[in-house]
Amino acid sequence: MSLASVLATVPTRQSYMHLSSAEKTVFYVVMAVSLALMIAQFLRRLPVWRKGVPIHWKPDPLGSIAKFILGQRKVQSSRPKSGAPMHLMIFYGFMALFLATTLLFIAVYGQAVGIPNFHKGAYYLAYESVFDVLGMLFVVGVAWAWGRRINLLRQHGPTVVNPETGKPEFNGNPLSHEVKDHLVLALLLLLGVGGYVLEAARMANTPQPWDYYAPVGYALSKVMPAISNDVYRGIWWSHAALVAVFFITLPQMKIKHIFTATLTAAGHNPEASMGRLEPITMAQVEETGRIGVATADQYTQWHLLSLDACMTCGRCTEVCPAHNVGKILNPKQVVADIARAAETGEEVAAAVSEEALWACTTCNACVEACPVLIRHVDMIVDARRHLVAEGRLSGSGATVLRQMAGTGNAWGAPAGNREDWMKGLNVPLARDGKPFEVLFWVGCAGATDPLGMRTSRALVDLLNKAGVSYACLGNEELCTGDPARRLGDEFQFQAQAEMNVAAFAKYGVKRVVTACPHCLNTLRNEYGDFGATLEVL
């Protein structure tokens, strides 16, 4: 039939076909109860989230949801060959099916409030064609996800729990393999395939001349035998039952992140920087009576919410350099441990283990990889701050802090030796009083480590040949304090920062060049909290 001929028949479809009034009532009750149970389970999580400290930043809910949820920004940047395309198919396929269901709901029930039935004619044909095809994204994506999970299980074997710690041992498989992980994918696949089976059954039961506008359902109907009314109703109720099961079990499955990740994105700090840690003030210490985080309820409410968004995908663990060289740190397990501590009230350091906390390099690779915006490093450093305040840091970390307090640098070199690398070079010093445009920030390694000193001398040679107007602070330069901050000694860092910022103000420093990546990050991203306005290169 031509399109004009099809439109002349006013194509549409009957809702609740072959269902009696009593069956419709039962359906409404079942859906209402299942939705109520789903909502109740999420509401039971509210007290856990509200234990935390209120956020102090102003979120951008619409912008963050558009970027990280609808745009899937973080998903696209990790696992580009497997996880990303698979998840994008599932997400956008799910969104298409959700939109299709919402439009159908409005068309059917909107008439009660005066909205005319628009689910017919050309709109209906377009609706059937577009959503029938887009729904296959969901089915293929879920099948891919389940197949990938099974393949990884075959390659690496099941997750083994360490009898001493009671925690899973990482065996090279980034995914966890609980039974419910497979059940949720089976349920999603049944929902997706079941929707097409139901559509095909409707066509086989009551053929219409426009059925071919839904190509997937139409093709499936051609291999079906004639469907009686009772068989159709049985298929319809089977699909409805799966939907009810989905609603009821959703809060207990990792698929719950469709809600919790959206809430996490809505509350995300749009000003959060990968390289900046949140400072602590003495006023905060006096108000709370603590430094850092001892128990999970001392994290912000947003951090506690973000823990529930974790779907244990393992992206964070895959990219963790400490984990990849055999250290105990497993960022995925850190999130699970803190989430457990939020439930039990256990000390965070005990739940995670102090060894794991100190193994973190604070590189933020885990944060960059996480598709649901969890800030692992913030939580780890806050726990470290508590340990340092309690005097529970020993070994090389404690040595670094003592050296920094005594000499002004993490290497323990005498403060008066920071100009030794300049011997034989014509290096201008800020204290000489000559005007300069750029401050060359040398850093502790550049001033005291033999290899670092070679780099500093080479950079001076380049600056001289380029005719740059520059100067160094020499012995007036102190460590930026970055090692102290990353280890958890926030106030040692702040003392160093304030002295350096005072030196910048003294010499009118506005532009800085440095060869040290750690110094670059601290000067560019963190010194602004202490009054410095710098362009750092």
PLM features per residue range, with description:
Residues 247-359:
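Ferredoxin-type iron-sulfur electron-transfer modules and their immediate structural context
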